[in-house]
Structure formats: C-alpha cells, structure tokens
C-alpha cells in the first residue's frame, strides 16, 4: 500500500474523474468552453468536493500551465487581509502564462474571514477583475457578506450520496490491493456522512490493520462502535433486556476505549433508523440530544446514555400500549 495520503493521491485531475456532481460539472464545463468565467463562490459542507472542483477547473482552463496561473490561499492560514492583498497584487501583476485571458485565485475558508476583511476582499476582487478571477470556498453561505455573494456565481455542494462514496472507496481499495466488505463500507459512511475526504482518510486508516477491511476493523481503527453491535444493543434495551444492554455499553467505553460522546452520536443515527412511527422520531432525537448536552456540560457519560435508553424504552412501551 502507498504511504501517500490517499485523498491527495486519488484526487481527481479532470471533470471526468469527479464522481457525482453532474450539474456542477456541466456549469463549469460551459465556462471552460467559453474561455471566460465570473467570480465563483463554492459553498457546502466539508469534503463535498469544493477544493477538488476548483483545482480541476484550473487544470481544465490552463492545461499544463495551471500551476503558473493559479494562486491558492487559505483565509485562516494567512496573517490577515493585508497579506492576502499583497500576494494577490504580486500574483496579478504579471500576465497569464499561455493563452489564458485571466489568472485564478482560489481562497479557501473564506467564511472564516471577518466582515471587515471580506469588505476589503471585495475591493481586491474589483481592483483586479480585469485579469484575475476568484473562486471563494466556504462551508457556510451565511458566513459570506451579501456584497460578495452578489458579485459571484454561487454554486452549492451537497454531501455525496452513499453510492458515489462506495464507488470511490471500492476503486481506491482495488488499486491499493485491499479487500473491503459491504458492511465496512456502510460503517465508513456512517462515520463520515457523505464527507469524501474523511471517508478516504478513514479507509486508509482502516487499511493499516491488514489486507482485508471488515466492519469490526473499521470500528476499531476509527474509535467507534461497530454499527451492527450497537443495533443489537439497542434492540436488547428496547426489548426490556436492559441489563445486557448496559453491560455492552459499559464494555464499549471501558474495554473499547470509545468516548461517550461518540457513542451518543452513533446512538442518534441508529435510533432514528428504528422501525417506529415517524411521529416518535423527533421525541427520540430530543431525548438523545438532552443526553448529549448533559455530557458536554460535565455529567457522567454512562449514566446519561443509560438514562436516554430507558426513556426511549418507556416511550416505545407506552405508545405500543395505546
């Protein structure tokens, strides 16, 4: 297996290599065909392809000269808007290499900038608009001021569907000579929730345990409870075998070294998959959220988990008797 970070090793280099995101690719291909584009704002959760798509667009626009014509900046890494201004000024001062009509600045984590810094960024974008285009990357659109939103074409990135994540993980596993079970893929997806970067990183971590990845090896490598074991524990608790369920949860924490907060997060996901009336699920979610909040405030983790399971059991038992 390669010692490189797999997420970087297998980062797509062209539109054709990008999984899913068909509508986004179609819009960006039009910009490439036209040879021009506006400022862009890519927004959406982490790991949904924003940085990858920005770099792919740079490669498609500039070909072999993409590095010379592209400046990557991270708003949280830079020492302030003055540093960004100076770097953009120096970058935009020279003409694009090749036949490109403009250069490209990719600014990650733009939503981490203060409002004042974003106002200054807006002026920088206007000042160098003649020969420079900006792609701003943000997790939260609410973190971007309206004057910047109005000067960009905004493109939303959503969490990737399970099928797309599975296909990419299988491709990487095959290339690295690793076997992975369907249950292991499910466990990775449960842990990462459509975040492709985290999913690939999780795959690489799990692969360090051997040439075959199972649900159990994923759980152990990522510090989570096996989803199968957690479902069995929930079923025990809700069928009234509370002593067995409590013993299992105690083992997850004490023997397995899994944090109570991680268990609560998994409980939330698994409990909402229960075959119960839909109107009960908000109540179940609220019970688990109360336990989560109490643990964050310093309450005893195991006690809160036991209490949440008992409340859910009581709720299910009561509604079944109506």
Curated annotation (Swiss-Prot):
Pfam families: AAA, AAA_lid_RFC1, Rep_fac_C. InterPro entries: AAA+_ATPase, ATPase_AAA_core, DNA_pol3_clamp-load_cplx_C, DNA_Rep/Repair_Clamp_Loader, P-loop_NTPase, Rep_factor-C_ssu_arc, Rep_factorC_C, RFC_lid. GO terms for cellular component: DNA replication factor C complex. It comes from the Archaea. CDD domains: AAA, HLD_clamp_RFC. GO terms for molecular function: ATP binding; ATP hydrolysis activity; DNA binding; DNA clamp loader activity. The keyword ATP-binding applies. Gene3D superfamilies: 1.10.8.60, 1.20.272.10, P-loop containing nucleotide triphosphate hydrolases. Disulfide bonds: none annotated. The keyword ATP-binding applies. One of its GO terms (biological process) is DNA-templated DNA replication. Keywords: ATP-binding, DNA replication, Nucleotide-binding. SMART domains: AAA (SM00382). ATP binds at residues 44-51. Heteromultimer composed of small subunits (RfcS) and large subunits (RfcL). Belongs to the activator 1 small subunits family. RfcS subfamily. PANTHER family: REPLICATION FACTOR C / DNA POLYMERASE III GAMMA-TAU SUBUNIT, REPLICATION FACTOR C SUBUNIT 4. Part of the RFC clamp loader complex which loads the PCNA sliding clamp onto DNA. NCBIfam families: PRK00440.1. This is Replication factor C small subunit 2.
